[in-house]
């Protein structure tokens, strides 16, 4: 039996094509994935991300707990509403999950974890609270009486559309810089996203989600499915958990070194392994020079040895096939490499691992 978000009926009313996404009944598109992708790059689109799991972390030892739990340093969170992207690691330095941590007060944080990893993440967090004997209470907000719905509104016109539909939120959100959140009435509005565009991710009581979804649609915001979400995040060079990294992959090998704070005395789970092992691979982009489509798990042949594509697809913005790949150290941006596509060695160019943001190509 597939799990359903609070917006399931709304998707079906809009004739969405539904698919099994990690055990969730989710919309892959509402007609044209390309049109949905372009709507976000050029105007505004909205996504149901209610399958993601908000987790409230409350208690006197919140900071101590989070400083030991993740590789990024929560000491950076000094202003209420500030968010931090972080990786939660196992003892071997592999990525259990990537998540966003919101600082609200010194005794109240909110974490958003991935849909498919929510159960294992919660179990890991609870185990660490017990092991470290900390005054921390962890409450998931996806399933149950106090569950939240989440709608991501993304694109250059996203803010204007949100203010049109929720005018009472404008004063608190107009000045939000990237990776900040504000609470207005029952809405938790964050200037975050997974598309490379401006916009908000809005959490609200689950019972309010369908009304907001329909109001946004009536205001001209295009509903977008998982298909467009994937090509948008790929163009933006954003990792997908389970594809670009997992529990066997170090954040240093997944292009996430910028989220790892090693230069302090702070200890965290997985730190010793990262220090011992260092970086073994590098995370770069590819653009296919021959005809074909780059896909995950295709082998990449370089002068320094073999690598592997972790995510690949056709880019609607570049009109080329692009990929993210884990490649040997020593490979340089601009190098020409070969990709094994159905037994044929096709040429590709190595690029930085970001292709398009803010409505245009950056390659």
Swiss-Prot record:
The glycine cleavage system catalyzes the degradation of glycine. Its EC number is 2.1.2.10. It holds the Pfam family GCV_T. InterPro entries: GCS_T, GCS_T_bac, GCST_C, GCV_T_N, GcvT/YgfZ/DmdA, GcvT/YgfZ_C, TrmE/GcvT_dom1. Keywords: Aminotransferase, Transferase. This is Aminomethyltransferase. It catalyses: N(6)-[(R)-S(8)-aminomethyldihydrolipoyl]-L-lysyl-[protein] + (6S)-5,6,7,8-tetrahydrofolate = N(6)-[(R)-dihydrolipoyl]-L-lysyl-[protein] + (6R)-5,10-methylene-5,6,7,8-tetrahydrofolate + NH4(+). Belongs to the GcvT family. One of its GO terms (biological process) is glycine decarboxylation via glycine cleavage system. GO terms for molecular function: aminomethyltransferase activity; transaminase activity. One of its GO terms (cellular component) is glycine cleavage complex. The glycine cleavage system is composed of four proteins: P, T, L and H.
């Amino acid at each position: 039996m597939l799990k359903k978000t609070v917006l399931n009926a709304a998707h079906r009313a809009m004739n969405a094509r539904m698919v099994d996404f990690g055990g969730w009944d989710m919309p892959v598109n509402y007609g044209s994935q390309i049109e949905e992708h372009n709507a976000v790059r050029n105007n505004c689109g909205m996504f149901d991300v209610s399958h993601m799991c908000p987790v409230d972390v409350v208690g006197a030892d919140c900071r101590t707990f989070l400083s030991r739990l993740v590789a990024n340093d929560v000491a950076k969170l000094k202003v209420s509403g500030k968010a931090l992207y972080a990786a939660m690691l196992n003892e071997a330095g592999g990525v259990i999950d990537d998540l966003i941590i919101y600082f609200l007060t010194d005794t109240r944080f909110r974490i958003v974890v991935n849909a498919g990893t929510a159960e294992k993440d919660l179990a890991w967090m609870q185990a660490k609270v017990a092991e470290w004997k900390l005054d921390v209470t962890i409450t998931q907000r996806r399933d149950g009486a106090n569950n939240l719905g989440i709608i991501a509104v993304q694109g250059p016109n996203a803010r204007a559309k949100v203010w049109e539909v929720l005018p009472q939120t404008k004063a608190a959100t107009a000045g939000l810089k990237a990776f900040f959140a504000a609470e207005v009435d029952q809405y938790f509005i964050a200037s975050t996203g997974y598309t490379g565009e401006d916009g908000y991710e809005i959490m609200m009581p689950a019972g309010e989600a369908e009304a907001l979804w329909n109001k946004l649609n009536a205001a001209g915001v295009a509903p977008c499915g998982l298909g467009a979400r994937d090509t948008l995040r790929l163009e933006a060079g954003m990792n997908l958990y389970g594809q670009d990294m997992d529990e066997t992959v170090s954040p240093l090998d997944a292009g996430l070194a910028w989220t790892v704070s090693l230069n302090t005395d702070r200890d965290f789970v997985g730190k010793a392994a990262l220090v011992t092992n260092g970086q073994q691979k590098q995370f770069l982009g590819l653009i296919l020079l021959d005809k074909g489509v780059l896909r995950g798990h295709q082998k990449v042949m370089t002068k320094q040895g073999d690598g592997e594509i972790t995510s690949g697809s056709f880019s609607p913005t570049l009109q080329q096939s692009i990929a993210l790949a884990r490649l040997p150290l020593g490979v340089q941006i601009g190098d020409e490499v070969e990709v094994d596509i159905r037994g044929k060695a096709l040429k590709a160019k190595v690029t930085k691992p970001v292709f398009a943001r803010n409505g245009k190509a950056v390659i």
